[in-house]
């Protein structure tokens, strides 16, 4: 791992998440450890994300937004981006076993971890979130594909999140539910049928024995965290 070129996670109060990636995480079953790793990635690239935010100039006109191809021109012949994350940022209270963190890294290399739009076939392709994970007693290292970075840097529509949220939640569904409900934040009240909620969260219809069990096993646990 070339540390001079690697993105390093930073201590921040908030991170930015693109709407594209938010939509992916809503339908993805991620563990709390995976969510912490994702937050570390977002903390490392926040300056890069700001380059893609469409800013309104003083004259009322919107400044020309940087394109991803222009940004990536400086990374010629490099299809992968390196990341370096201190273990004590993922496991600050040292309550997790290192083996659990390593298992989460391996899980995130799964080809089916997420699906991205593939314009070349007018469809989707399954891709891992990270590649080539490695670790020692102080750091974890991995790489992100250019296609993943493009998804994370698409700031046409984005949201702000507390970076330490996965450190404070007791269940992994809390972040998932929060990301889902973010799109309704400008609406005072939202009414959804039980089946529609399951569909939007990509939860199998037979996962719970009716809305009562969903409320008991999913919503009530999320409410405790929020």
Model regions: which residues?
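Charged, alpha-helix-forming regions
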Residues: 1-225
């Amino acid at each position: 791992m070339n540390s001079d070129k690697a993105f390093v996670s930073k201590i921040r109060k908030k991170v930015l998440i693109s709407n594209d990636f938010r939509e992916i995480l809503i339908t993805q079953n991620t563990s709390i450890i995976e969510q912490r790793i994702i937050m570390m990635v977002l903390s490392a690239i926040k300056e890069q994300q700001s380059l893609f935010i469409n800013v309104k100039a003083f004259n009322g006109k919107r400044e020309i937004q940087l394109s991803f191809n222009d940004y990536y021109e400086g990374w010629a012949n490099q299809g992968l981006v390196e990341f370096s994350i201190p273990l004590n940022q993922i496991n600050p209270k040292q309550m997790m076993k290192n083996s659990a963190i390593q298992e989460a890294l391996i899980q995130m290399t799964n080809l089916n971890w997420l699906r991205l739009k593939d314009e070349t076939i007018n469809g989707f392709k399954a891709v891992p979130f990270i590649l080539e994970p490695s670790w020692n007693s102080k750091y974890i290292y991995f790489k992100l594909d250019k296609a993943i970075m493009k998804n994370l840097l698409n700031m046409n529509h984005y949201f702000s999140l507390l970076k330490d949220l996965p450190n404070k939640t007791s269940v992994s569904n809390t972040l998932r539910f929060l990301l889902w409900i973010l799109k309704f934040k400008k609406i005072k009240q939202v009414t959804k049928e039980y089946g529609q909620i399951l569909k939007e969260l990509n939860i199998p219809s037979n996962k719970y024995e009716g809305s009562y069990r969903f409320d008991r096993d999913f919503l009530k646990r999320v409410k405790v965290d929020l």
